[in-house]
């Protein structure tokens, strides 16, 4: 549905100074619209069966490049550094299947690439969770540590053919700070057992120093991992 695609592009506020990295171009319908607005579009597609189709649909564009590679194996930091020599902003636009949403977002954040923003179409339930300030997980804390997240648009299942079983939504993450790579290990460990206290979960990392470290960070040891604030986790990284 061209109207929906144009609305999606409008939410991203891209311009000719922007280079877009698109994950999963599919048949290239969104890529085409992105190319009209962005300076350059680099698409990553894992499915080589789409080679001929994408060549046909996007071949006439001089500012689109399609790379057939699993995005999770891409050295994103290096690529963004190269692209920023030509473009003032680099952002990611992605259509993320449910089963790989977290993996892709974590890969992007952990790369520490100097992106301006991430715009992703995800399952509606996932979008509502990630933008709910009362819901906490390692991923929501990772996002909060680098910037802000918003739900920018609802996308009905009926605009797709064939229609999927669920509705989707566009989320945007605007990046203001570099990611602290020490957070990844800390958050994963803190959330290993959500029902356990932060003290019990972090003992694996800090051992006999756990009590002292929590005191230094002014964190009550009987708190659950989701009850902490991102500032608490950032304080804890200093002891790793």
Predicted feature locations:
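Catalytic cores of RNA-modifying enzymes
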Residues: 1-189
């Amino acid at each position: 549905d061209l109207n929906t695609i144009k609305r999606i592009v409008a939410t991203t506020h891209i311009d000719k100074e922007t280079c877009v990295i698109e994950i999963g171009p599919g048949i290239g319908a969104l890529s085409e619209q992105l190319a009209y607005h962005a300076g350059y579009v680099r698409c990553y597609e894992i499915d080589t069966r789409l080679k001929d189709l994408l060549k046909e649909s996007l071949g006439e564009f001089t500012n689109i490049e399609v790379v057939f590679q699993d995005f999770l194996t891409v050295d994103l930091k290096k690529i963004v550094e190269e692209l920023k020599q030509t473009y003032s902003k680099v952002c990611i636009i992605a259509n993320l299947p449910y089963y790989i949403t977290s993996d892709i977002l974590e890969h992007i954040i952990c790369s520490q690439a100097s992106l301006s923003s991430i715009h992703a179409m995800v399952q509606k339930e996932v979008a509502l969770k990630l933008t709910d300030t009362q819901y906490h997980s390692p991923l929501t804390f990772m996002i909060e540590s680098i910037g802000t997240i918003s739900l920018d648009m609802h996308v009905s299942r009926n605009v797709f053919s064939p229609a999927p079983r669920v509705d989707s939504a566009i989320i945007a993450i605007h990046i203001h700070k570099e990611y602290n790579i020490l957070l990844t290990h800390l958050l994963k460990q803190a959330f290993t057992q959500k029902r356990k206290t932060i003290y019990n979960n972090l003992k694996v990392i800090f051992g006999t120093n756990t009590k002292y470290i929590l005191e230094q960070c002014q964190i009550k040891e009987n708190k659950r991992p989701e009850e902490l604030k991102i500032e608490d986790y950032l304080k804890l990284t200093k002891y790793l």
